[in-house]
Every structure is written in C-alpha cells, then in structure tokens.
UniProtKB/Swiss-Prot annotation:
The keyword Transport does not apply. It comes from Acidovorax ebreus (strain TPSY). Pfam families: Frataxin_Cyay. The gene is cyaY. NCBIfam families: FeS_CyaY. GO terms for cellular component: cytoplasm. This is Iron-sulfur cluster assembly protein CyaY. One of its GO terms (molecular function) is ferric iron binding. Belongs to the frataxin family. It comes from the Bacteria. Keywords: Iron, Metal-binding. GO terms for biological process: iron-sulfur cluster assembly. Involved in iron-sulfur (Fe-S) cluster assembly. May act as a regulator of Fe-S biogenesis.
Amino acid sequence: MTDLEFMDRAEKLLLAVEQSCDRINDTTDADLDGQRTGGMVTITFRNRSQIVINLQKPLHEIWMAAQSGGYHFRHDGTAWMDTKGAGEFFAALSHNATLQAGEALQFTD
C-alpha cells in the first residue's frame, strides 16, 4: 500500500470512529467524549478511562491503546486487522469500549 492509500484508509477509519461516538451518544447514555487531534482520536468514558487511537504513518498501522493493552492494526486489503491475530479493528474497539464503559457499545465503519 502506498502512503497515499494508507492515509486515505486511515482517515476513513478515524472519521468512522468519530461518527460512531456521535451515534452512540445519540442512542445511549454512554456519554462518550471523542476528541480528534490530527491523526489521533481519544475517547474518554464517564469513568475517565480512555481509549486512544492513532496513526503510525511510517509503519502503515493504526494503534489502539486501551485499559486491556495496546493493539496494532494493518489493512489487509479488506479490513484493518490486528497484527497478532486478535481480529478486526472495529470488533476490538467495540469490545474494549464495552469493557471500559460498563455497557454494550458498538462501533462500526
């Protein structure tokens, strides 16, 4: 993948995360605070815990830091997949957000 392709796909992912935060806030009482700064989105939960998602341009990866640990995702041509085989980005984000929020949350692309 070229740098331009990476940036296009990565920007779409970050936008989808922001839009999911808005949708979740509109349809639940989760009260997420999603803040975008450049190539990073920080999601802050009611309990003040956070999930941080950021671009790693030189590696063509998306990194996610959650209470459960750090995750690296690389686009496989179809989806952003964990580099250690732990699954797809939005499934991992939904799982970690659910754990940190204490209620079921669904992030989608």
